Amino acid sequence: MNEQPRTRTRTRLAPGIRRASILDAATRLILRDGTTGLTMEDIATEADVARGTLYLYFDSIDGITSALRDRYAQALTGELEPLLATGGSGSRLRRLDTFIAALASALHDHRELHHALFTHARVAEDPLTAAFRALLRRFIQDGRDAGEFPVPDPDLTTAFLLAGLHAVLTEGLHKTSTATTIAAAQKLARRTLSP
Protein backbone atom coordinates (compact mmCIF):
# COMPACT_ATOMS: atom_id res chain seq x y z
CA MET A 1 0.00 0.00 0.00
CA ASN A 2 1.44 3.29 -1.08
CA GLU A 3 0.02 6.02 1.17
CA GLN A 4 0.85 9.58 0.47
CA PRO A 5 1.57 11.78 3.49
CA ARG A 6 -1.33 14.04 4.32
CA THR A 7 -0.67 17.67 3.74
CA ARG A 8 -2.56 20.38 5.52
CA THR A 9 -3.64 23.43 3.73
CA ARG A 10 -3.72 26.48 5.89
CA THR A 11 -5.83 29.45 5.24
CA ARG A 12 -3.86 32.60 4.69
CA LEU A 13 -5.12 35.34 6.97
CA ALA A 14 -4.22 38.98 7.30
CA PRO A 15 -1.70 39.45 10.14
CA GLY A 16 -4.19 41.20 12.42
CA ILE A 17 -6.75 38.46 11.93
CA ARG A 18 -4.16 35.71 12.45
CA ARG A 19 -2.94 37.40 15.64
CA ALA A 20 -6.51 37.67 16.94
CA SER A 21 -7.19 34.01 16.10
CA ILE A 22 -4.09 33.00 18.06
CA LEU A 23 -5.27 35.06 21.04
CA ASP A 24 -8.74 33.51 20.73
CA ALA A 25 -7.18 30.04 20.79
CA ALA A 26 -5.09 30.94 23.85
CA THR A 27 -8.22 32.26 25.57
CA ARG A 28 -10.08 29.00 24.90
CA LEU A 29 -7.20 26.99 26.35
CA ILE A 30 -6.87 29.22 29.41
CA LEU A 31 -10.60 29.03 30.12
CA ARG A 32 -10.63 25.28 29.65
CA ASP A 33 -7.32 24.24 31.25
CA GLY A 34 -5.89 27.26 33.10
CA THR A 35 -2.46 28.79 32.58
CA THR A 36 -0.40 26.21 34.48
CA GLY A 37 1.50 24.07 32.04
CA LEU A 38 0.27 25.99 29.00
CA THR A 39 2.78 25.70 26.17
CA MET A 40 3.36 27.42 22.87
CA GLU A 41 2.76 24.06 21.18
CA ASP A 42 -0.66 23.78 22.86
CA ILE A 43 -1.60 27.21 21.55
CA ALA A 44 -0.28 26.50 18.06
CA THR A 45 -2.32 23.30 17.92
CA GLU A 46 -5.48 25.01 19.19
CA ALA A 47 -4.99 27.89 16.75
CA ASP A 48 -4.25 25.45 13.91
CA VAL A 49 -0.98 27.16 13.04
CA ALA A 50 2.58 25.92 12.83
CA ARG A 51 4.74 26.70 15.84
CA GLY A 52 6.93 28.83 13.60
CA THR A 53 3.92 30.91 12.64
CA LEU A 54 3.04 31.36 16.30
CA TYR A 55 6.56 32.62 17.01
CA LEU A 56 6.20 35.22 14.27
CA TYR A 57 3.53 36.85 16.42
CA PHE A 58 4.57 36.06 20.00
CA ASP A 59 7.92 35.13 21.48
CA SER A 60 6.64 33.37 24.60
CA ILE A 61 3.67 32.42 26.76
CA ASP A 62 4.32 35.64 28.69
CA GLY A 63 4.02 37.59 25.45
CA ILE A 64 0.69 35.94 24.71
CA THR A 65 -0.71 36.49 28.21
CA SER A 66 0.48 40.10 28.11
CA ALA A 67 -1.33 40.60 24.79
CA LEU A 68 -4.43 38.94 26.26
CA ARG A 69 -4.34 41.29 29.27
CA ASP A 70 -4.02 44.27 26.92
CA ARG A 71 -6.90 43.06 24.75
CA TYR A 72 -9.10 42.39 27.78
CA ALA A 73 -8.33 45.82 29.25
CA GLN A 74 -9.01 47.62 25.96
CA ALA A 75 -12.32 45.83 25.46
CA LEU A 76 -13.51 46.49 29.01
CA THR A 77 -12.43 50.11 29.18
CA GLY A 78 -13.80 50.76 25.69
CA GLU A 79 -17.16 49.46 26.86
CA LEU A 80 -17.17 51.40 30.15
CA GLU A 81 -15.33 54.64 29.33
CA PRO A 82 -18.37 56.39 27.81
CA LEU A 83 -20.15 56.06 31.16
CA LEU A 84 -17.63 58.41 32.80
CA ALA A 85 -16.95 60.69 29.84
CA THR A 86 -16.40 64.31 30.79
CA GLY A 87 -19.36 66.42 29.85
CA GLY A 88 -21.67 63.39 29.92
CA SER A 89 -25.34 63.75 30.76
CA GLY A 90 -26.74 63.13 34.23
CA SER A 91 -25.20 63.76 37.61
CA ARG A 92 -21.68 62.51 38.07
CA LEU A 93 -22.67 60.35 41.03
CA ARG A 94 -25.41 58.63 39.00
CA ARG A 95 -22.96 58.07 36.15
CA LEU A 96 -20.47 56.64 38.63
CA ASP A 97 -23.18 54.30 39.99
CA THR A 98 -23.91 53.14 36.43
CA PHE A 99 -20.19 52.66 35.76
CA ILE A 100 -19.72 50.58 38.93
CA ALA A 101 -22.75 48.40 38.13
CA ALA A 102 -21.53 47.82 34.57
CA LEU A 103 -17.98 47.11 35.78
CA ALA A 104 -19.17 44.62 38.40
CA SER A 105 -21.38 42.91 35.85
CA ALA A 106 -18.55 42.67 33.30
CA LEU A 107 -16.10 41.35 35.90
CA HIS A 108 -18.67 38.81 37.07
CA ASP A 109 -19.41 37.67 33.51
CA HIS A 110 -15.71 37.23 32.70
CA ARG A 111 -14.40 36.28 36.16
CA GLU A 112 -12.61 33.09 35.05
CA LEU A 113 -10.65 34.86 32.33
CA HIS A 114 -10.01 37.90 34.54
CA HIS A 115 -8.71 35.68 37.33
CA ALA A 116 -6.48 33.69 34.98
CA LEU A 117 -4.99 36.78 33.35
CA PHE A 118 -4.55 39.12 36.31
CA THR A 119 -4.23 37.14 39.54
CA HIS A 120 -0.68 35.94 38.97
CA ALA A 121 0.48 38.65 36.58
CA ARG A 122 4.06 39.60 37.29
CA VAL A 123 3.74 43.21 36.23
CA ALA A 124 4.10 46.43 38.20
CA GLU A 125 0.67 47.68 37.10
CA ASP A 126 -1.49 45.70 34.77
CA PRO A 127 -3.05 47.46 31.78
CA LEU A 128 -6.55 47.23 33.25
CA THR A 129 -5.56 49.01 36.46
CA ALA A 130 -3.63 51.64 34.50
CA ALA A 131 -6.59 52.28 32.19
CA PHE A 132 -9.06 52.57 35.06
CA ARG A 133 -6.67 54.80 37.00
CA ALA A 134 -6.54 57.25 34.08
CA LEU A 135 -10.30 57.05 33.51
CA LEU A 136 -11.20 57.64 37.16
CA ARG A 137 -8.59 60.41 37.47
CA ARG A 138 -10.16 62.36 34.58
CA PHE A 139 -13.65 61.81 35.98
CA ILE A 140 -12.69 62.92 39.49
CA GLN A 141 -10.83 65.99 38.22
CA ASP A 142 -13.84 66.94 36.07
CA GLY A 143 -16.15 66.60 39.09
CA ARG A 144 -13.76 68.61 41.23
CA ASP A 145 -13.52 71.36 38.61
CA ALA A 146 -17.33 71.50 38.46
CA GLY A 147 -17.55 71.76 42.25
CA GLU A 148 -19.39 68.45 42.58
CA PHE A 149 -16.55 66.49 44.21
CA PRO A 150 -14.94 68.42 47.10
CA VAL A 151 -11.82 66.26 47.16
CA PRO A 152 -8.49 67.77 48.26
CA ASP A 153 -6.24 65.79 45.90
CA PRO A 154 -7.55 64.06 42.74
CA ASP A 155 -4.51 61.75 42.48
CA LEU A 156 -4.79 60.45 46.05
CA THR A 157 -8.56 60.21 45.76
CA THR A 158 -8.17 58.21 42.55
CA ALA A 159 -5.69 55.84 44.21
CA PHE A 160 -7.96 55.42 47.23
CA LEU A 161 -11.11 54.88 45.18
CA LEU A 162 -9.40 52.48 42.77
CA ALA A 163 -8.01 50.39 45.63
CA GLY A 164 -11.36 50.41 47.44
CA LEU A 165 -13.35 49.43 44.36
CA HIS A 166 -10.85 46.70 43.56
CA ALA A 167 -11.09 45.28 47.07
CA VAL A 168 -14.89 45.41 47.24
CA LEU A 169 -15.42 44.00 43.75
CA THR A 170 -12.77 41.29 44.07
CA GLU A 171 -13.96 40.08 47.46
CA GLY A 172 -17.64 40.74 46.95
CA LEU A 173 -18.07 39.03 43.63
CA HIS A 174 -16.68 35.82 45.14
CA LYS A 175 -18.66 35.93 48.38
CA THR A 176 -21.98 37.72 47.97
CA SER A 177 -24.57 38.46 45.37
CA THR A 178 -23.70 40.80 42.56
CA ALA A 179 -26.43 43.23 43.68
CA THR A 180 -25.01 43.39 47.23
CA THR A 181 -21.51 43.91 45.89
CA ILE A 182 -22.62 46.67 43.52
CA ALA A 183 -24.50 48.48 46.30
CA ALA A 184 -21.46 48.31 48.60
CA ALA A 185 -19.10 49.58 45.90
CA GLN A 186 -21.47 52.42 44.96
CA LYS A 187 -21.79 53.48 48.60
CA LEU A 188 -18.01 53.46 49.02
CA ALA A 189 -17.51 55.55 45.89
CA ARG A 190 -20.21 58.07 46.83
CA ARG A 191 -18.77 58.54 50.32
CA THR A 192 -15.30 59.01 48.90
CA LEU A 193 -16.25 61.61 46.31
CA SER A 194 -19.13 63.43 47.97
CA PRO A 195 -18.84 63.13 51.75
Regions found by a protein language model. Name each.
Residues 65-72, 117:
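Alpha-helical DNA-contacting segments of helix-turn-helix folds
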